[in-house]
C-alpha cells in the first residue's frame, strides 16, 4: 500500500498538468468593419504558456461604396473595393476566467487593396468562450492602421469559431 501511494504521489508531483497549453486551433471569423467593410478571416492559432497565443492569419474583405451613376449600392460596383492580407498576431492574455479569457492582440500585416500593396499594424481585444467540446466562440474588437494607400484605418467587430485539431 505504501508503494502504491508513493508511486501515485510521485506521478502527481513529477508530471505537469497545464490546461490549454500547446493547443492548436483552426479559426474562422467574420464581421463588419468601419467604413462599410465586410471582413472574413481564416487562421491557425497555437497557444503558448499562461493563456497567451500566436496566430497566423489570412484575411479577405470588401469595402463597398455607392455607385455614382445610380446613387445607391449596386452589384456593378459592390465588389470593386476588395482587399486581402496576411499577418502574424501575438495574443497576450489579460484575464482568465473559468471557461473564457480576454486577450490583447497585436501584430503586423501585409496585403493589397485594389491592386496596391500595403503594410498594416493590427491591435484589439479578443474574448473567447470555451465549450465543453473544446470548440471556442470568439468575439473580436479589431483596429487596423494601414500604410501606403488611402484606406488607412479599419475598426469593427468580428465573431467566429475556433476548432481544435
Identify what each model region corresponds to.
Residues 54-82, 112, 119, 139:
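Flexible, solvent-exposed loop segments that connect beta-strands
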Residues 19-66, 162-164:
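Short glycine/proline- and aromatic-enriched beta-strand/turn motifs that initiate or cap beta-hairpins
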Residues 1-23, 165:
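Cleavable N-terminal export/targeting peptides
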Residues 28-32, 56-62, 88, 104-112, ...:
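Transmembrane beta-barrel strands of outer-membrane/channel proteins
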Residues 19-23, 50-51, 94-102, 115, ...:
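Short loop/turn motifs that connect adjacent beta-strands in outer-membrane beta-barrel proteins
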Residues 86, 152-165:
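Outer-membrane beta-barrel "beta-signal"
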Amino acid at each position: 500500500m505504501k508503494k502504491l501511494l508513493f508511486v501515485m504521489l510521485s506521478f502527481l508531483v513529477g508530471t505537469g498538468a497545464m490546461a490549454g497549453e500547446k493547443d492548436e486551433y483552426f479559426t474562422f471569423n467574420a464581421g463588419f468593419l468601419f467604413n462599410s467593410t465586410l471582413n472574413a478571416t481564416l487562421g491557425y492559432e497555437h497557444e503558448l504558456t499562461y493563456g497567451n497565443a500566436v496566430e497566423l492569419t489570412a484575411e479577405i474583405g470588401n469595402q463597398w461604396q455607392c455607385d455614382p451613376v445610380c446613387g445607391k449600392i449596386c452589384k456593378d460596383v459592390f465588389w470593386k473595393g476588395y482587399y486581402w492580407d496576411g499577418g502574424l498576431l501575438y495574443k497576450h492574455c489579460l484575464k482568465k476566467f473559468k471557461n473564457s479569457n480576454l486577450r490583447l492582440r497585436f501584430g503586423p500585416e501585409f496585403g493589397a487593396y485594389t491592386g496596391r500593396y500595403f503594410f498594416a499594424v493590427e491591435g484589439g481585444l479578443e474574448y473567447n468562450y470555451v465549450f465543453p467540446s473544446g470548440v471556442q466562440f470568439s468575439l473580436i474588437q479589431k483596429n487596423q492602421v494601414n500604410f501606403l494607400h488611402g484606406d488607412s484605418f479599419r475598426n469593427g467587430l468580428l465573431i467566429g469559431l475556433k476548432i481544435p485539431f
